[in-house]
Every structure is written in structure tokens, then in C-alpha cells.
């Protein structure tokens, strides 16, 4: 629907606009019979992280019935790509494709979880922006024929298929701002790869938040025990070893010859965190960096509601044991980013933003009922001393984001160094904490952290940690 900025991209269920929170999904194994055994786990991982949509990416497969039935039963919406990714289609096979489309649509159209069908992944972008005509020597008549075939398939055959148009939404290409129009932030959907492939900082997620962001992400390494399952001698490894290089498939020669995902992981770690000294620290910091990126993106998109109405990161799962953009590794272990997304996707969250020399405190309520409560904001030193505090009774309205406090930054610091304080935020209702968060005023590497003395106690199946000062991003692991 058109508005004063362009055209929105909303999903409306039972007459209510729903903010979409989810991820891109790829087959969880190369072998389909093994992949089907993982459906329950992947969908549970999505539910446990407060997701309401998975995008079945066009470079994978049309999944088995069990996958769609599980999504139906668990309330997970599906963005269903047709299986065309980063490619153009040769002429002369339209009839065969029509048969394939009818088979696919007739098999899947009964599933209420399918919320949208999409013609292809990044084919429009590749043709108009990535220089495919030059790369594949398509000029003159060849170029016209290739483009006409694209138009026939994605803007005529599929667009006017009664099976889709009468019952479902159809979108010709992801990303795009409309039929044959490249993506922009004013209409349609976006793939935000300025972060990662463009080496932009994480505030790009806020600066370029469009109507619906259906891809974004950065890589991280899986935990050490996962790597040991495909190479037991990992303790003697570095990122340059051929075994790890083999599993790194993100290549970026336009930045520099030989530049790959490991270089980019190192690039982003060094922007936000201290330089790692060994492979174990690289693994840990890569996951913390990915978590920071996805949390920043998800909160930025949610704060931009209702202009932005959806966020789908790349990607929830892995197809093999590898180094990738996933938040859950091949063996089902959550990375730090999946825990971060679980928090950022909660129905009600409290978060902050520095803008125009003020600290803005948001409460975002995606529920279809209002909630009354109290927000409590404390400015603290790193060892827990409260410097200032603010408290306000609020009503978080149905399906909205609201700014409840707008605090001048000058009044917050008052001769305190930005790197030695943080803001502790909580929203309470009926004396129960609904959500909590922390806002730092500097990059993690610039926080004046002290050496922490941490005491761990175990009570039945609960581990409690106590520290004499702020201990940031604690990671617990077990060999069991």
C-alpha cells in the first residue's frame, strides 16, 4: 500500500498488522532424509528465540510436507521463495517451468503457514547491478531474450497464477522496491549487506532501515567443541590452516585479492573488541561480535516500527559443519547471536538510543493488548554504584513502539567518563520484570573494564555467578 514515503510492506493477520521477527532458513543437511530429522529442532530453535517467520530461501529446496506441517502447528509463518537464486533463466523452458510451478503450488497451497510466495532471490539485483551481461557476454539480442524470459516467468506466469494471486501474496524478486525496481529504503524489501560485504559499521542498520529487511548478517565461528568434531587436532590450528580455509566460502575479491570471511570477521572484531590472541579468543569474539550486530539490527528495525515492519536475519541454520552466518551450528548448538536474538525478539522489550544529544528510552510492545507498568532506569558505575536513577509509570500501548524518556546526555554524564558508566534498564508489571537491558556509551573495547573476581555456585540445575565488578559477555561451556 502506498504512503507518503513510498509503499509499505506489511503482513496483516486477522486485520492486525504484525511485525515480523525471524530468520532465513536453508536445508539443515545436504541429504534430504537426514535433513527431515532436524525439522523439529530448527523450528523449536525459532520458537524459543521468539520468531514468527522463516524464509525458505530460493537457493535451497521445496521442503518436505513435515516441515510445512510443523510450521502450521507451531504458528511459524513462511516466506516461500521459488527455487531461483542469483541466476537468470535460459529461454525455451517456460513450459517445463510452468509444470514445475503448478506441481509446487498445488502441493503447498494447502498450508496456511505460507504467508507470501516470492519469485526469486537476488536475480533482479544480479542482472541490474552485478554486471552479469558483461560477465556472461550477454549483449544485444541475447541480453534482450534473457531479460524477456525473466519478465515472462516472474512478472507474468507466476504473478497471474490464480493459485497464488487469489489466495496469497506474491512478490517477484527479493530484494526489490516493486516490479523490476531495485531495492531502496522507501518501498518493498531490502537485503542489507552494507554490513559485511560493504564493511560498514553496525549503525548502518539504523541509518538504512527500510520497510522490510529480509536479509542481513555477519559470520561467526562455531564453538570449539563443534570444530573438534570435524577436526580433533584443532588445538594446534590457526585460521590459515587448509582445513578451516576449506570451510570458509565467503570470498570478497573486490575488496582485495584473497580477501575472505576470516578477514572480515577479523575486521569487525577489531572495530568493536580487543584484538584476540589465539584461536579460542577468535571463536569467542566472533560470536560476541555477531551477537552485537544482530541485536543492533533487530532493535533498530523494531524501533523504526511502523515504517519498518519486518526483520529476517541471515541465517538460522547450517547445511554442514562450517563457518557461516548461522546463529545455530550444524550440530544444534546455539551461538551467542541466537541468545541475543531471543532477547531482541521478545514481544515486549526496553531499549535505548542516543540521538540528537539525548538518550531515548523505548518500550516496544508487539502484543495485541496494552500493558501497564513501570520503567526503572539507573546510571551505574562498572562496580555497581548507582549515580542517578529515573522511574516512570507507563502504559505500553497495543502493537506500538513508544519513547517514554528523553534524557539530555549532558545531564547523564556530569563529569563522568563515558567509558566507566552504563545504563541499566528494566520494565516491570505487577512487580515482575518483563524485560531488562543495558546500554553502553562506548564500543565494548573502550569500556574501562576491571579484572573481575567471579564466584560460581551451583544449586541443583542452576548456576549462579557473582562478580565484584561488571563482567561482560560471560560464556559458560562444558565438555559434556
Language-model-detected regions and their locations in the chain:
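Flexible loop/turn segments at secondary-structure boundaries
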Residues: 27-30, 61-64, 86-88, 123-127, ...
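Substrate-binding clefts and catalytic carboxylate motifs of secreted carbohydrate-active enzymes
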Residues: 117, 124, 160-187, 191-371
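Active-site neighborhood of glycoside hydrolase catalytic domains
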Residues: 73, 90-181, 289
Amino acid at each position: 500500500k502506498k504512503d507518503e514515503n513510498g509503499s509499505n510492506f506489511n503482513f496483516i493477520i486477522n486485520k492486525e498488522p504484525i511485525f515480523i521477527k525471524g530468520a532465513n532458513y536453508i536445508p539443515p543437511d545436504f541429504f534430504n532424509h537426514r535433513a527431515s530429522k532436524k525439522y523439529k529442532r530448527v523450528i523449536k530453535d525459532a520458537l524459543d528465540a521468539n520468531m514468527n517467520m522463516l524464509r525458505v530461501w530460493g537457493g535451497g529446496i521445496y521442503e518436505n510436507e513435515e516441515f510445512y506441517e510443523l510450521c502450521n502447528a507451531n504458528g511459524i509463518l513462511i516466506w516461500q521463495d521459488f527455487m531461483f537464486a542469483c541466476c537468470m533463466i535460459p529461454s525455451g523452458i517456460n513450459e517445463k517451468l510452468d509444470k514445475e510451478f503448478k506441481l509446487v503450488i498445488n502441493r503447498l497451497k494447502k498450508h496456511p503457514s505460507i504467508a507470501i510466495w516470492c519469485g526469486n532471490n537476488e536475480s533482479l539485483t544480479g542482472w541490474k547491478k552485478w554486471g552479469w551481461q558483461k560477465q556472461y557476454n550477454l549483449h544485444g539480442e541475447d541480453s534482450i531474450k534473457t531479460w524477456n524470459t525473466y519478465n515472462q516467468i516472474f512478472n507474468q506466469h507466476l504473478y497471474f497464477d490464480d493459485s497464488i494471486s487469489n489466495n496469497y501474496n506474491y512478490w517477484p524478486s527479493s530484494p526489490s522496491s516493486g516490479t523490476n525496481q531495485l531495492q531502496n529504503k522507501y518501498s518493498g524489501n531490502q537485503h542489507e549487506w552494507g554490513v559485511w560485504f560493504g564493511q560498514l559499521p553496525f549503525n548502518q542498520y539504523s541509518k538504512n532501515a527500510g520497510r522490510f529487511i529480509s536479509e542481513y548478517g555477519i559470520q561467526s565461528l562455531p564453538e570449539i567443541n563443534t570444530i573438534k568434531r570435524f577436526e580433533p587436532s584443532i588445538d594446534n590450528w590457526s585460521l590459515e590452516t587448509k582445513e578451516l580455509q576449506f570451510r570458509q566460502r565467503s570470498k570478497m575479491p573486490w575488496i582485495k585479492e584473497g580477501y575472505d570471511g576470516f578477514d572480515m570477521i577479523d575486521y569487525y572484531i577489531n572495530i568493536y573488541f580487543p584484538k584476540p590472541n589465539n584461536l579460542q579468543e577468535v571463536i569467542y569474539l566472533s560470536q560476541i561480535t555477531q551477537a552485537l550486530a544482530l541485536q543492533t539490527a533487530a532493535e533498530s528495525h523494531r524501533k523504526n516500527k511502523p515504517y519498518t515492519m519486518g526483520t529476517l536475519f541471515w541465517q538460522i541454520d547450517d547445511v554442514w559443519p562450517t563457518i557461516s552466518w548461522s546463529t545455530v551450528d550444524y550440530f544444534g548448538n546455539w551461538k551467542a547471536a541466537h541468545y541475543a536474538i531471543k532477547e531482541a525478539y521478545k514481544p515486549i522489550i526496553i531499549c535505548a538510543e542516543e540521538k540528537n544529544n539525548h538518550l531515548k528510552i523505548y518500550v516496544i510492545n508487539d502484543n495485541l493488548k496494552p500493558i501497564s507498568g513501570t520503567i526503572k532506569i539507573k546510571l551505574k558505575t562498572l562496580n555497581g554504584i548507582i549515580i542517578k536513577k529515573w522511574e516512570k509509570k507507563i502504559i505500553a500501548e497495543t502493537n506500538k513502539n513508544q519513547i517514554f524518556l528523553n534524557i539530555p546526555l549532558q545531564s547523564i554524564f556530569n563529569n563522568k567518563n563515558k567509558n566507566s558508566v552504563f545504563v541499566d534498564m528494566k520494565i516491570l508489571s505487577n512487580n515482575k520484570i518483563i524485560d531488562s537491558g543495558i546500554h553502553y556509551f562506548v564500543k565494548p573495547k573502550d569500556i574501562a573494564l576491571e579484572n573481575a573476581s567471579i564466584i560460581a555456585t551451583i544449586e541443583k540445575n542452576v548456576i549462579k555467578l557473582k562478580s565484584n565488578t561488571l563482567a561482560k559477555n560471560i560464556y559458560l561451556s562444558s565438555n559434556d
